[in-house]
């Protein structure tokens, strides 16, 4: 089994690569390959599209790599391969985004991506830094041995 992380010169590729390599090593999930080669995308078993930055810029970068977007669409729509988008990679699954300008997405999710405008203009978006997490209810994703969880993440919106 091969998981490809698509390299289209958009941001958080290195951290995503390290996370998937660790997951693969711990679970035996197979090879993790970083690529911008459309043929490697077609040959992969699973596809991950990371992304960091503005929706229109990421889309332009992705569609600027010859054949790459077509290979993703073919793998997902025709071959039904599992696909995961991270950050802007996830946003591009929607019909369109409205960050700075209207920009088409893949259209796999019937939705639109709009920039968040906080009620307090002094609040930064995206939020970056350390925060204490308040657990409202148990969830299988949360490890039961963490009594005082906190998280650091750049650009995560919870």
What residues fall within each predicted segment?
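Pocket-forming structural segment of enzyme catalytic cores
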Residues: 95-158
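N-terminal beta1-alpha1 cap of cysteine-dependent amidohydrolase-like domains
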Residues: 1-83, 88, 101, 110-124
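Conserved catalytic-site region of short-chain dehydrogenase/reductase
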Residues: 91-93
């Amino acid at each position: 089994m091969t998981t490809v992380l698509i390299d289209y010169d958009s941001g958080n590729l290195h951290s995503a690569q390290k996370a998937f390599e660790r997951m693969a090593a711990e679970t035996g999930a197979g090879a993790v390959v970083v690529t911008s080669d459309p043929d490697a995308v077609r040959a992969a078993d699973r596809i991950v599209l990371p992304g960091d930055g503005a929706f229109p810029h990421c889309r332009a970068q992705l569609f600027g790599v010859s054949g790459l977007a077509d290979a993703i669409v073919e793998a997902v729509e025709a071959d039904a391969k599992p696909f995961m988008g991270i950050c802007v990679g996830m946003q591009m699954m929607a019909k369109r985004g409205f960050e700075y300008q209207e920009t088409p997405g893949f259209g796999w999710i019937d939705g639109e991506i709009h920039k968040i405008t906080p009620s307090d203009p002094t609040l930064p978006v995206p939020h970056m830094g350390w925060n204490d997490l308040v657990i409202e209810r148990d969830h299988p994703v949360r490890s039961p041995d963490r009594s005082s969880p906190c998280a650091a993440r750049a650009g995560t919106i919870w």
